[in-house]
């Protein structure tokens, strides 16, 4: 849950590192630091502080830093408080190091190597630096090999040695590292986002391989000193796609990018009006040979799975379960070779989802993943991958990753319905044609953003807010509620409307905001009755309703009419409306929308 960057080349390293760290802040932003090699003396100088990258930039701008080689880190505290001393990089003797992960046996290492007196921080990371310095006798690789043989846990280590000018070393276990070589030099990072300003080509550093970054080349070796050729991947992200492009926050930019992201996600998977995964290498048998499906995911990705579950069960009539990845292994799930396990993750690095996937494979399940980053850990662990085309998503609160995940699931539902004989070819084409309308309909929702902003202003002071809906509406409100609590810090809960009388209605008092969605015609009458019920208890109603269903509504409701689609697809335009609501509440409250307190985007520690 930390951000890492390393660079050696021809550019001013200070600017490269700080710019990259700003792009990596969503991985953690309670402290930041850089270490740079002085151009003449080759001494490694460290600049770090508790606080944001902007605080670090202010410190660095006050110094004369002349260097073209260095490493950087944004921290999300797991061991030790948020202090200058606990910020990375850590220095011990000739070693300067940044680390992502958790070293589980750090206390034992402190005792075994009598390190207590030389440590300056409370972190497990500095223990790794001290151990490296203990073993370093002039051969960096030998010191690295001896050190990692003693470590238990997860780690991505990026290292500078005092007497190795302009060279950066790295090794990892579980925690991700990607790297590249480009005309400006050689780079590595914990996330592809930090590299895409320079190149679209990169490679994933394999576990327990030592990477050397030199100014004009890289060397990758295994622990037996065999040279390994990096396997370069390409990504079609624009080189400037990780910027805000004039928007005040990444979240707003990413909401606005959704029509194009969905178009890019589905366009190459529709052939002659039918779903086609040939280009993904996914065989039809994957969807016909399974008796049941299990989605494993966390947070927003799990909510995408809940929508998929409702669609698969109602349309394809196949049993589908959705499991929290963090609980999956402990629940003794019923998994066998006839189970299709689908892992969903924006980053492809979510540690709980990765571990759940590994467990499912050990039980013999076929594994498909829906992710946004090529070459990520979950992609490499999966039998098959369906990539979304969301592009870089920087805001901690996910928006376009969620809706592109949904668009992939719609394709999967159509494919399964066709292959299993539930849909004829013509019915499948009709379903796909409606999916192709989604970008246009989403754009119409985005054009209503001023109306949604007006409603957002009316709930700024709310301490509690409830969301109610039935069927697919309930599934999307779980995500809408999560978005609101993530970025606005309003206590928000989503309930299935039929459960109101089983407890939640006791919380409704005068002026309690209640957000409802009505997009499913067959459930409309029951849902409107539930809305009237909470209205009679004094609730203030915000209603997002499919335009064709709007008819005669209570004039006291605050209503946003959503452009019409077939009921099964209303999830997508309604999701955008709920994202906008959360965004405007947060921005109007003056919060940092992109970096909600206590949250990091990529969870890489259990």
Label each PLM-derived region with a short phrase.
Residues 288-437, 470, 517-563, 581, ...:
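Glycine-rich phosphate-binding loops that contact phosphosugars or nucleotide phosphates
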Residues 258-262, 266-294, 384-513, 587-606:
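Active-site phosphate/pyrophosphate-binding segments
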Residues 1-244, 248-249, 260-267, 271-291, ...:
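Conserved short alpha-helical segments that host acidic/polar catalytic motifs at enzyme active sites
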